[in-house]
Curated annotation (Swiss-Prot):
Protein name: Small ribosomal subunit protein bS20
Designated gene of the protein: rpsT
A single GO molecular function term of this UniProt record: structural constituent of ribosome
The species this protein was found in: Limosilactobacillus fermentum (strain NBRC 3956 / LMG 18251) (Lactobacillus fermentum)
UniProt superkingdom: Bacteria
Family that this chain belongs to: Belongs to the bacterial ribosomal protein bS20 family.
Length: 84
C-alpha cells in the first residue's frame, strides 16, 4: 500500500477510472449483443438498437477505451450484419 498522500489519491482515482471504464466497455458489448440477438429474433426495433450500438462504439472510442481501428472495424461489421 502506498504511504505518500498523493500516491494514495492516485490509487483511489485509478480504481474509480477502472470501474468507469469497465462499465463503459460492458455497456458497449451489451449494446452489440442486444442488436445481434434482436436481429436473429427478427425484432421490430432493429433501427434503434443499431443506432444505440453505433453510439456505444463511438462513445467508447471518444473516451479512449478502444482504438480508432477497432471502432471502425466493429462499426463496419455491425453495419454488414444490419444490412443482411
Amino acid at each position: 500500500m502506498p504511504i505518500i498522500k498523493s500516491a494514495i489519491e492516485r490509487v483511489r482515482v485509478n480504481e474509480k477510472a477502472a470501474a468507469r471504464n469497465a462499465s463503459q466497455m460492458s455497456a458497449m458489448r451489451t449494446a452489440i449483443k442486444k442488436f445481434d440477438k434482436a436481429k436473429l429474433a427478427g425484432a421490430d426495433n432493429l433501427d434503434d438498437l443499431y443506432k444505440a450500438a453505433i453510439s456505444a462504439i463511438d462513445h467508447a472510442h471518444s473516451k479512449g477505451l478502444i482504438k480508432a481501428n477497432k471502432a471502425a472495424r466493429d462499426k463496419s461489421r455491425l453495419s454488414a450484419r444490419y444490412a443482411k
